[in-house]
Amino acid sequence: MTVQVQDHDITTAADTAKLPQPMQPPLKQATYKTHTTDFIVNELLPLEFTGEGEHLWLHIQKSGMNTAYLAKLLSEWAEIPLRDVGFSGLKDRHALTTQWFSLRIPKKQLPDSEFAPVDISANESVTILEQQWHNKKLNRGTHRANQFIITLRDIEFASFEASLSLQISASEQPMSAKQAVEQHLTTISQSGVPNYFGPQRFGRSGNNIREALSLFARPVPESRPQPNKGKRKRVPREQNSMELSAARSLIFNEILAARVRDGSWNTGLAGEVFNLDGSGSIFASDEIDHTLRARLETGDIHPTAVLWGTSNEKVSGKAAAMETDIVAQSPLLMQLAVGLEQRDIKAQRRALRLPIEALSWEWEDKEDGQILVLNFTLTTGSFATSVLASLVQELITSSYSRS
């Protein structure tokens, strides 16, 4: 019998601010996204263009609109099908972002007018920074990383006791609140942070999880026979990708939270599946030996957890038992897991640890108080909010980005 999941349970589970951290965040409170330029995202896509071909690549800076909407505007301008517009990743609407788009334009017949959409609001802007011809379309997931420049305002430091916890020894002079923040930043630049999925994955108050439960309550669509072939074709999942991703992400976050609580998120367990840093390569190990410990300490490899689905055979031992136990103890997670399996979603692995590249920071004194500007790079598929959550106990989103 299926246990009824309470609406409050969904809201609570989707609240990423309540997820545990390995260290006490040194900032009690801060506000971000007060202005568009407080959250800057630059897509890092090293590429040598051929200078020829039928794909026009545009390097675009935008704000106030999401990536999918801009792709639609570009297709209308070029008078091409939306499927002929390519981009690598989705960028935040409430940010100043730069990313590449590709437009398949046969015979290089460009529109008569420059791209300058007129039906956009005062809060929306689009600027073409560069254009190149290339012989290939830009496919999803092509870029390797994103650079973030994030400004935190209205900063309130954590208690003096929390600052003391970051001292190296009791004999040292007590740290100032600002020094405690800088020590924390230095530490996470070396050790990384828990690789949680961010709140945007779950929608407002967890609505994407509610949509997933609604989807899983419906009959599973039957596969259709392919003409002249013995195989059966699965029903496309693109239309439900948001719900499926939210379900897998919530299960992953809960497993990672348990690993943070027991301290194994960056050390591994028996039967662990490891991810090779900077790649999609994984390998399993029955035990954690000296060599693996050394590689974990240097950040060469990372422990992983499951993105739930079928065929999850690689993990074993204590690591496997922990994953299944966490799901079994929660009616919400159980319903999500069963729904994913019934739709034949194949299990994948995701690193538990998120390395932070090129982390730097700068303090600025303003009339209304100090602000902290962070500059760092994260691999594709990770969330800047995971870095902010490790630093700030209560991160307040400005009313600008909630509009």
Swiss-Prot record:
Keywords: Isomerase, tRNA processing. Pfam families: TruD. GO terms for cellular component: cytosol. Residues 1-10 have a biased composition (Basic and acidic residues). InterPro entries: PsdUridine_synth_cat_dom_sf, PsdUridine_synth_TruD, PsdUridine_synth_TruD_CS, PsdUridine_synth_TruD_insert, TruD_catalytic, TruD_insert_sf, TruD_pseudoU_synthase. The keyword Isomerase applies. Residues 192-354 form the TRUD domain. Its EC number is 5.4.99.27. One of its GO terms (biological process) is tRNA pseudouridine synthesis. The active site is at D92. It catalyses: uridine(13) in tRNA = pseudouridine(13) in tRNA. Belongs to the pseudouridine synthase TruD family. Responsible for synthesis of pseudouridine from uracil-13 in transfer RNAs. PANTHER family: TRNA PSEUDOURIDINE SYNTHASE D. This is tRNA pseudouridine synthase D. It comes from Psychrobacter arcticus (strain DSM 17307 / VKM B-2377 / 273-4). The gene is truD.
